[in-house]
Amino acid sequence: MSFKPIDPKRDEIRRYLERGSVLDSLTKLFIRVIKERPENPMDYIRNHIGVVRHQHDKYERLQQDLQLANEEIQRLRAIINGINPDVLQGHQPVASSEVVVATEAPQTVAESTEAAEQQQQQQQQENGETELEKPNESSADVAEITAAVEACQIEGNSVVTTDEAAQPSPTVQAEASGSSE
């Protein structure tokens, strides 16, 4: 057998088709035709030629959704971290046992907040400290903020890194292969 050099034009076309993932798509399609053995292979190829591209588009859309969700998480964390800790300082945290039915919860929170304010005022008077009341701040507002902060339990590392997002998960692959049938 003699060795034939690869025609440069052929090699250029092959690289072009590989770059556009055309060869990969066609190979997968031909493998499915061989496995399923449809009655009319040409119709099957015509109907399923864009499925691989659809899967790629779906994967890109999911990556964009993940990125938007991560940005939203970062934005909300900044808001939570931006809450003035001085406003919340000295108030008793709302325990999960104190959370009652929705109609009773505001009263319980308000009562515990008032008790905490009285304790704080007594401590300040004993220590000789005086604090001016803030006119725009009511005990209900403070109680609401305290309850909201206590209810927000953000995990430390819940944001998916870009490297993790770049790896397709087995469930996405299974879903994509299951939808093409």
Swiss-Prot record:
Keyword Nucleus belongs to the record: yes
InterPro entries (UniProt xref): AMY1
GO MF term list: transcription coactivator activity
Start-end of Low complexity biased regions: 111-127
Source organism, top-level taxon: Eukaryota
Keyword line: Nucleus
Gene Ontology biological-process annotations: regulation of DNA-templated transcription
Subcellular location: Nucleus
Region (Disordered): 111-145, 159-181
SUPFAM superfamilies from the UniProt entry: Dimerization-anchoring domain of cAMP-dependent PK regulatory subunit
Gene Ontology, cellular component aspect: nucleus
The keyword Disulfide bond appears for this protein: no
Annotated Polar residues bias: 168-181
Family the UniProt entry places it in: Belongs to the AMY1 family.
Protein name according to UniProt: c-Myc-binding protein homolog
